[in-house]
Amino acid sequence: MTKNSSRRLFLRKTAMATTGIALASTSSLLNGLTKDDSPFNGYNPYTEQKTDLRTSLIGKEVIVTGTLYDATGNKPVSNAKIEVWHLSPNSQKYNHRGKMYTDKNGHYKFISDWPNQEQGKQPRIYFKVSQNDTVYFTELIFNNLGAHISCKHWEKQHVLGEEKLFPTMKTSLNTSKINFNLSINTNQYI
C-alpha cells in the first residue's frame, strides 16, 4: 500500500510539473508578464538611454525638441523620463527607440532617422512620459508638409494653449526640426 501512495504522489507531482511547464511556456502568459500596457505597438520597457537613434548618417533625419510642463502648462518639469520609439526606415519593425530625461528647464531633445509609416497612416513617433507614478502616452504625427497631433493629444494637452500645444516643423535639405511640447498630470493616463 505504501508503494501505491508513493507512486500516486509521484504521478500527481509529475502531472502538476508538466502542467506548470506547459502554462509557463505559452506566449500569452509570457506576454502578460512582460508586456507594458502601452496603447501603441512597439513599446519596449528595456530601452537604453540614448538621444541619437540614427542608424545611418546618410538619409532623411528628424530632430525633435520640446519642453515638458506641469499640469498647469506653465511650469517646466525636470528629471522626467521620456521614452520614444518608431518604425525603422524601410521596415515594419520598431528598432528605433531611446530613453532620455528632461533637464532642469524641462527640455528634451533627440535625433533619429525619418520613420517608416504603418499602412494607411502618416509617419509617427510614439512617446511615453513618466514622472513618479504618473505616465502619459502620446504620438507625434508628421509628413513632408508639417507636424501634427492626434485628437487624444489635444484633449489631454490643451492646457498648454495654442502657442505651446501645436508642434512646429522646419525643414532644410534632409533634416526636419520639430518642436513638440508636452504636459503631464495625474489625470492623463491612457
Language-model segments: residues:
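N-terminal secretory signal peptides and thylakoid transit peptides that target proteins
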Residues: 1-21
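Residues in and immediately flanking transmembrane alpha helices
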Residues: 25-26, 83
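Bacterial Sec-dependent signal peptides at the C-terminal "C-region" and cleavage site
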Residues: 26-34
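Beta-strand-dominated extracellular/periplasmic modules and repeats
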Residues: 35-162, 174-179, 188-190
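Acidic, serine/threonine- and proline-rich intrinsically disordered appendage/tail regions
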Residues: 166-170
